[in-house]
Amino acid sequence: MKNILTEREQNVLFYVSQGLINSEIAEKLHISVHTVKAHLESIYYKFKVANRVQAAMKAIALGIIDLKAIA
């Protein structure tokens, strides 16, 4: 299931899991806040979830995000 996400979507999810807000993620990735929101919407659709917390939890459960990398 990891391959279902683009590299950029994985980057966005990593920063979501670290607790960053959209504007902080945009700054880190050198993209617009609108683009961050678009990536999140795509992630929600692919994961069949409703919000960023559910998306991060699913990514951790699927091994897309390593908890050790967050700490």
Question: What is each residue range found by the language model?
Answer:
Residues 10-17, 44, 56:
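Hydrophobic residues on short alpha-helical segments
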Residues 17-20, 62:
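Short helix-capping/turn signature of helix-turn-helix
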